[in-house]
């Protein structure tokens, strides 16, 4: 029996004693090599859960077992800040530096993972300063380089990875993520974009009412809740969560 990469049991957390809990008796398990989503409306606690996983929050009840070292975790926050004076190709240099890679080693990995469309896209922006390209372009570049070059990582935590990224480049990014999970990497990503969980049979956790439920895919999500259309059911779940915050 394999040991889960991440295991959380009966976790409860509140930012302050007199505030309602963000999580109440939350449990989840993530295995090595999984691509798994985290669905929930803003602010359902997706970012807070990621902060807990990476050790940014410690005042919780319950158990959180990380069966990986700090160097085996790569986390992408929702907001990315880069110096505007950097050229986009220098982002590659920074990631090489953090991962102790030579440019030759990096390009070997990039050539192995990227298809022609990636190189066409990269060539268009690589000499530009980061302030001259869109937020989505910067995000696409950083994620593409991170998942390609962070070879020691076992778990990637991606908080809303495709926010601001055009649909065609979003699809390229998911193809790349599928490649690294096929190689045994684990990707746990948060999203509130419905379609990102319907294009493939992607398992996901649903955050609702301060707790969490796991579904094997969107069909399981529908069948478990006796609904006939995906969007109607999702809206019902998120509506329950939203109205509870108003009471």
Swiss-Prot record:
Residues 6-234 form the ABC transporter domain. Coiled coil: none annotated. Signal peptide: none annotated. Gene3D superfamilies: P-loop containing nucleotide triphosphate hydrolases. It comes from the Bacteria. Pfam families: ABC_tran. Together with two further proteins McbE and McbG this protein causes immunity to the peptide antibiotic microcin B17, which inhibits DNA replication in enterobacteriaceae. Immunity is determined by two different mechanisms. McbE is involved in the production of extracellular MccB17 and, in a complex with mcbf it also serves as 'pump' for the export of active MccB17 from the cytoplasm to the periplasmic space. Belongs to the ABC transporter superfamily. This is Protein McbF. It comes from Escherichia coli. The lineage of its organism: Bacteria, Pseudomonadati, Pseudomonadota, Gammaproteobacteria, Enterobacterales. The gene is mcbF.
